[in-house]
Amino acid sequence: MNLELLESFGQNYPEEADGTLDCISMALTCTFNRWGTLLAVGCNDGRIVIWDFLTRGIAKIISAHIHPVCSLCWSRDGHKLVSASTDNIVSQWDVLSGDCDQRFRFPSPILKVQYHPRDQNKVLVCPMKSAPVMLTLSDSKHVVLPVDDDSDLNVVASFDRRGEYIYTGNAKGKILVLKTDSQDLVASFRVTTGTSNTTAIKSIEFARKGSCFLINTADRIIRVYDGREILTCGRDGEPEPMQKLQDLVNRTPWKKCCFSGDGEYIVAGSARQHALYIWEKSIGNLVKILHGTRGELLLDVAWHPVRPIIASISSGVVSIWAQNQVENWSAFAPDFKELDENVEYEERESEFDIEDEDKSEPEQTGADAAEDEEVDVTSVDPIAAFCSSDEELEDSKALLYLPIAPEVEDPEENPYGPPPDAVQTSLMDEGASSEKKRQSSADGSQPPKKKPKTTNIELQGVPNDEVHPLLGVKGDGKSKKKQAGRPKGSKGKEKDSPFKPKLYKGDRGLPLEGSAKGKVQAELSQPLTAGGAISELL
C-alpha cells in the first residue's frame, strides 16, 4: 500500500494480536530498521534472525555469537548491524553477506548498543557497572563519557534524534546532556519524586520525529520531556515534564518503553506480565491495553517506524499487534464517491464530446492549457514518511530488502544428466580439476576468509566477575547446583525410551511349526517389497 494513502485521521495505534513470528530458537530482543521493512531478532543461541516484515518470512540467519544476544541496533542505511552478547562482546555485521566486520571485547556485560543516528562510524555502548563508552569503528578507539560522580555504577545513555547530544542517567536520578563531538556538559537536571527524594533512571528513549524524549524511572512513572526546554534550562535546571504516565491501579513497573513512529503515542511493556499500555502523548490519557498470554513475562517491545504495528517478545516468541483491518467491498463512482447501490448514470449534454460547441471561449482556452501541461513521470518524489523533518532527499544506497535466492539441493539421481559413457570421462576431468584445486589451495593462491579484528577494551575500576541480568543474579547457586541421585520419576528405569524396539533373535516369538515356520524365516531374511512377502503372508 502507498504510504501517502494511509489513513491519518483515525486512531493510529494497534488494537489486537496479528500473529506471531517463530524464530525456532528463543527470541530475546528485536528492532526494526529505519523503514520497517526488516526486523532483526536476537536469539538465545546467539543467532540473529532477520525477518522480511512484508512477507513475514525469514530473509537471513546470521550465526553471530556463542552466547545469547542481548542488544541490537541497525545502522542508518540498513547495511550494517551491531549486536552485543552476554559474553561481553560487541560485533558489527554486514547484513548482505552475514560476515563480521570487527569485534570488541569488554570486561563487563553490555546492557545496550546504539549506532549514531547520522554517523554509522560511531557506536554508543553501555557496559554494566561502568560509564558509557563511545566507540569509533574506523580506528577501533574508544572514549569513556564523563559521569556526574565516580561512584555511579549503573549509567544508561542514548543519542538524541540527530546525534548531536548524548543523554546519560544514573541511579541517583541525575540526567547529563553531553555534546557528542567534545563530550562537554551542556545541560543537566535531576529527576525527583513528589518530595526531594530521587529515583533511579532505567532507560532513556527518543522519538523519531520532534524533540520529545521519555525517561523510565524506578518509581514506576514514565516522564516525557521536551529536549529544547532541557537545553534552554542549562546546567542544574529544573524542567517540568510534559506528561507523567503510570498505572495508578496496579502500580506496574515498566520493562521497556518507546514512542510510536510519528511520536504521538507511547507504549510501555509491563515487567510483571505480557501486557502493553498505550498512551496518547499530547493529553496523557490511556487509550489501549493489549493483553498477551497469561503467565508470560515481557522481554522487549518495538514500534514499527511507519505503521501502527507493535512487535513484542515473551516466552521466546515475537508477537505482532496491529489494527483490525475492515474490508470494504463497496462500489465507487469515477469521482471516488461511495455507492450504496447500483445507479444508472445520466450523461450530461455534450459531456463526452471531443469538441464541445457549447463551451465559451475562455473555458476552451483553459482546457487547452490543461491539456498542454507536461506531466513529470521520470523523477521520484521522496516519501515523507521515510524522511526526517530536516531532510529533503532519501538515501539512494539504503538497504530496504534482502535478496532471497532459493537453496537447491543436489538430487540423488539427475534424470537430465549425460549418458553413462560420458559420465566416466567427466569423472576423470573432475578428478583432475580437484587435484588442481588442492594444489592451488596448498600453494596459497586462494586467499582464506578474512577473520574479523578483535579489540580488547580496557576500563579501569570495572569488576570482571559481573553476570548479565539475562543470565541471573551474581552468586546465584541455583543455576550451578547439580541434582543429587537419580532423576525424579525414573525409579531405576533405563535412560532410553521404554518403547525401544527389541531385536529378533532366532525363532523366539514365532509360534509356527513345520513348513510355515521355515517359509516365514526365509521371508524375514529377505528385504520386504511392496506387494511381495507381506501379500504372501496375508
Curated annotation (Swiss-Prot):
A GO molecular-function annotation: transcription cis-regulatory region binding
Positions of the UniProt region annotated as Interaction with WDR5? 371-380
- WD repeat ranges? 22-63, 64-103, 148-188, 196-235, 249-291, 293-331
What Pfam families does UniProt report for this protein, alphabetically?
WD40
Mind telling me what this protein is named? Retinoblastoma-binding protein 5
- Gene symbol of the encoding locus: RBBP5
List all Acidic residues biased stretches.
344-360
Role summary = In embryonic stem (ES) cells, plays a crucial role in the differentiation potential, particularly along the neural lineage, regulating gene induction and H3 'Lys-4' methylation at key developmental loci, including that mediated by retinoic acid. Does not affect ES cell self-renewal. Component or associated component of some histone methyltransferase complexes which regulates transcription through recruitment of those complexes to gene promoters. As part of the MLL1/MLL complex, involved in mono-, di- and trimethylation at 'Lys-4' of histone H3.
Q: How does it assemble?
A: Component of the SET1 complex, at least composed of the catalytic subunit (SETD1A or SETD1B), WDR5, WDR82, RBBP5, ASH2L/ASH2, CXXC1/CFP1, HCFC1 and DPY30. Core component of several methyltransferase-containing complexes including MLL1/MLL, MLL2/3 (also named ASCOM complex) and MLL4/WBP7.
- Phosphothreonine is found on 252
Keyword line = Chromatin regulator, Isopeptide bond, Nucleus, Phosphoprotein, Repeat, Transcription, Transcription regulation, Ubl conjugation, WD repeat
Per UniProt, the ranges with Basic and acidic residues bias are: 491-510
Please name the Gene3D superfamilies in this protein's record.
YVTN repeat-like/Quinoprotein amine dehydrogenase
Q: Which organism is it from?
A: Homo sapiens (Human)
The answer, when asked if Metal-binding is one of the entry's keywords, is no
GO BP: DNA damage response; response to estrogen; transcription initiation-coupled chromatin remodeling
What highest taxon heads this organism's lineage? Answer: Eukaryota
Which of the residues bear the PTM Phosphoserine?
350, 388-389, 497, 525
Ranges where the record places region Disordered: 344-377, 408-538
Q: In which tissues is it expressed?
A: Ubiquitously expressed.
SMART domains from the xrefs?
Answer: WD40
In residue numbers, the region (Interaction with ASH2L) covers: 330-366
Q: Name the reported effect of residue 375 to E.
A: Significant reduction in its ability to stimulate KMT2A methyltransferase activity in association with WDR5 and ASH2L
In the UniProt record, which is one GO cellular component term?
nucleoplasm
Note the position of the cross-link Glycyl lysine isopeptide (Lys-Gly) (interchain with G-Cter in SUMO2).
Answer: 129
InterPro entries annotated for this entry? RBBP5/Swd1, WD40/YVTN_repeat-like_dom_sf, WD40_rpt
